[in-house]
Amino acid sequence: MGFLKAYEVTLLLFGLSETLVVVFYVVRSQPKTISVEFYDWFIAIVGSCAPLFLRPAEWGVFPMAKYAIIAGAVFQIFSIFSLNRSFALVAANRTIKTQGMYSFIRHPLYASYCLVYFGYIMSNTTIENVAVYAISMLFLYLRIIKEEKHLALDPLYRQYQLKVRYRLVPFII
């Protein structure tokens, strides 16, 4: 059921945010460096595809979690515009981003994914969705580690890590 039948703003915002991901991926700038390690590519592909296995459910632990999806989608939109043409699937250094959402946390786009997926499984709760969420979060964590390892080869990124200490949630992680 689409937005026009359900009149759900969550579907509209999620569709908009994912469309922006595709647009910025297509118009991304050329990387200065890009990881050529098989493991990095494997993590990026599995991590990107795993959420595609989330499925709607008849029941949710917390149906009002759709507001987490809305917040996550809005956060994702701001993060994508902050990242702009530096969008990548695999660890790559296009430009070290330090402005916008990146002035608060180092991985705002990943943080938005966590929030959207969490909201989704809380409002569409099944064992399968929880398993997909767990796998997605594991691969997202691995992506962060591999991406930061690659970006830390750039002295500007190491300075940025000292300035912006938190990866996903300010003052926590």
Q: Where do the model's predicted regions map?
A:
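Solvent-exposed interhelical
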Residues: 94-112
